[in-house]
Amino acid sequence: SGFGIVPLNIMPHYLAYLTAYEQTKEILESYEEETGRKICTINDGDGIIISQAGKKGRYIKDERYTPIVAPGMSEYQAYFFDLYGTLIDIHTEEGDHELWEFMAKYYAYKGAKYGSWELRWRYGALIHDEEERLLHENPKQIPEPQVERVFMRLYEEKGVRVSIQEAVDAAQVFRSFSLRYVRLYYGAKELLAHLKKKGKKLYVLSNAQQVFTASELRYLGIYDYFDKVCLSSDYHCKKPDAAYFKALLTSEGLDPTKVMMIGNSEYDDIRTAKSLGMGACYIHSNLSPEGETANCDIVMRAMDLPSLEKILCREAHLA
């Protein structure tokens, strides 16, 4: 069917199992030939945007989800991409009791003995404590802790001294066990490759943890498309904080009017970008708030990166 569990050593001291789904027409057609079943959609988002139209191999667009493009849209020289819900589809289960039972055993091996419920409670409390610490240091910013500090403090609370690498390992084990799948949306690589070929500068601006996301970008094969990867944990603040946007604009010497923000959250991505004079593209994906939309240069009313590629890569003709 195209789904599979892929074993991959992407982090030290454990085997991560990441779900991969290769969304290609060839796989769908092969599946139809082998099973005799018709595929009605290859979209995981809120709306069916590509569907089988009766005749084998013929795919049509649903007009309800046609992209909206503002007239006279400027040509942009650089793009800031959100990750999860924009380029990457992900599902984690951090509330799973089996996760916390496993992590309690993991900590016990290092001499830090927790019950599963105690560990879960202390984890949440320490996340909040780290946010309060950062807020006290800079009251004007929206705080984003580094999760490895939390896992370090969980050891320290039980009187166990570990290295920062051991805290990072614990964080990555936590991520791998809670992860149900992480995969690219259909057309993500092609979009990045085409923009790169046109000489555009590509950046990540995402609310994410360095200890999780850098490895996931490499696993998915898109890390090297970006000129710079900015993750909120490295900046101790997160979107929609304008300081986070400005940090990347300033460090790269970018003119905001020549940069487009592409994301799936009107609140986190679009509002601040527009307030700074940037262009903006909103994508309503399966991870966007239900019923949300936006008023910006491009509105993708469903996840459809191939159509976005066509829009962006001929943008000079739209201006």
What do these predicted ranges mean?
Residues 43-45, 83, 206-208:
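Short, well-ordered beta-to-alpha junction loops that form the rim of enzyme active sites
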Residues 66-122:
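Active-site neighborhood of HAD-like aspartate-dependent phosphohydrolases
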Residues 104, 117-173:
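A metal-dependent, Asp-based hydrolase signature
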Residues 142-149, 176-203, 214:
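Short, acidic loop-to-helix structural element flanking the phosphoryl-transfer center
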Residues 17-22, 91-98, 136-143:
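Short, flexible/disordered intra-domain loops and linkers
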Residues 63-79, 90-91, 114, 165, ...:
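Asp-based, Mg2+/Mn2+-dependent phosphohydrolase catalytic module
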